[in-house]
Amino acid sequence: MIIKENSDKQTQIYNFLIEFTKSKGYPPSVREICQAVSLKSTSTVHGHLKRLEKKGLIYRDPTKPRALEIVELSNEEKELIDIPIVGKVTAGMPILATENIEDMFQIPINYVKHNNDLFILKVTGDSMIEAGILDGDLAIIEQKNIATNGDIVVALIENEATIKRFFKENGFIRLQPENKNYEPIIVEDCSILGKLVGIYRAY
């Protein structure tokens, strides 16, 4: 759907909403919108969102944070895929071994770029909140055993899976939390189980 007679800024906001939601699986916060389109005032963003809602391009639930729905995306055909929820991770055992799978979870296929080699881990704790990953979220992970600096990965440390941002530097691996209250984990080596490709959050 094309926005007619809109300011450039409003078009930028709408395009960012679509891009962010397709990439992350959930809508951006108002502050994230501000940063993306170089606006300092959250009230200005709220004004643009209100006008987009009046045009029927988005729907917002004022009682819930981030509860914003893009009508164009909602009207797309939502093919569902089953992704295994991994309840535990054991060293030396394939991540998708039957005994590791706790349940299956269906999500619209447009929440992820592909449906190959995916699994879900339930997020516990607040060590990644500044990356928008909250306690109770379902982290959608693509199985990979390698990572690039800056990737958010699932790493196996002492038989326990942890979600952190990956950096390899000076012969060591730094697993960096996204919460200033937590210290990074520095190790010589670790097993990379996968890379974060999406977050699913129930409101």
Swiss-Prot record:
<feature type="site" description="Cleavage; by autolysis">
    <location>
        <begin position="91"/>
        <end position="92"/>
    </location>
</feature>
<feature type="active site" description="For autocatalytic cleavage activity">
    <location>
        <position position="127"/>
    </location>
</feature>
<keyword id="KW-0804">Transcription</keyword>
<dbReference type="InterPro" id="IPR036286">
    <property type="entry name" value="LexA/Signal_pep-like_sf"/>
</dbReference>
<dbReference type="GO" id="GO:0006281">
    <property type="term" value="P:DNA repair"/>
</dbReference>
<dbReference type="InterPro" id="IPR050077">
    <property type="entry name" value="LexA_repressor"/>
</dbReference>
<keyword id="KW-0068">Autocatalytic cleavage</keyword>
<dbReference type="Pfam" id="PF01726">
    <property type="entry name" value="LexA_DNA_bind"/>
</dbReference>
<keyword id="KW-0678">Repressor</keyword>
<comment type="similarity">
    <text>Belongs to the peptidase S24 family.</text>
</comment>
<keyword id="KW-0742">SOS response</keyword>
<comment type="subunit">
    <text>Homodimer.</text>
</comment>
<comment type="function">
    <text>Represses a number of genes involved in the response to DNA damage (SOS response), including recA and lexA. In the presence of single-stranded DNA, RecA interacts with LexA causing an autocatalytic cleavage which disrupts the DNA-binding part of LexA, leading to derepression of the SOS regulon and eventually DNA repair.</text>
</comment>
<keyword id="KW-0235">DNA replication</keyword>
<dbReference type="InterPro" id="IPR015927">
    <property type="entry name" value="Peptidase_S24_S26A/B/C"/>
</dbReference>
<dbReference type="InterPro" id="IPR039418">
    <property type="entry name" value="LexA-like"/>
</dbReference>
<dbReference type="GO" id="GO:0009432">
    <property type="term" value="P:SOS response"/>
</dbReference>
<dbReference type="InterPro" id="IPR011991">
    <property type="entry name" value="ArsR-like_HTH"/>
</dbReference>
<keyword id="KW-0234">DNA repair</keyword>
<dbReference type="InterPro" id="IPR006197">
    <property type="entry name" value="Peptidase_S24_LexA"/>
</dbReference>
<dbReference type="GO" id="GO:0006260">
    <property type="term" value="P:DNA replication"/>
</dbReference>
<dbReference type="InterPro" id="IPR006199">
    <property type="entry name" value="LexA_DNA-bd_dom"/>
</dbReference>
<dbReference type="InterPro" id="IPR036390">
    <property type="entry name" value="WH_DNA-bd_sf"/>
</dbReference>
<keyword id="KW-0805">Transcription regulation</keyword>
<feature type="DNA-binding region" description="H-T-H motif">
    <location>
        <begin position="30"/>
        <end position="50"/>
    </location>
</feature>
<dbReference type="GO" id="GO:0003677">
    <property type="term" value="F:DNA binding"/>
</dbReference>
<protein>
    <recommendedName>
        <fullName>LexA repressor</fullName>
        <ecNumber>3.4.21.88</ecNumber>
    </recommendedName>
</protein>
<keyword id="KW-0378">Hydrolase</keyword>
<dbReference type="GO" id="GO:0045892">
    <property type="term" value="P:negative regulation of DNA-templated transcription"/>
</dbReference>
<keyword id="KW-0238">DNA-binding</keyword>
<dbReference type="InterPro" id="IPR036388">
    <property type="entry name" value="WH-like_DNA-bd_sf"/>
</dbReference>
<dbReference type="InterPro" id="IPR006200">
    <property type="entry name" value="LexA"/>
</dbReference>
<feature type="active site" description="For autocatalytic cleavage activity">
    <location>
        <position position="164"/>
    </location>
</feature>
<dbReference type="Pfam" id="PF00717">
    <property type="entry name" value="Peptidase_S24"/>
</dbReference>
<keyword id="KW-0227">DNA damage</keyword>
<dbReference type="GO" id="GO:0006508">
    <property type="term" value="P:proteolysis"/>
</dbReference>
<dbReference type="GO" id="GO:0004252">
    <property type="term" value="F:serine-type endopeptidase activity"/>
</dbReference>
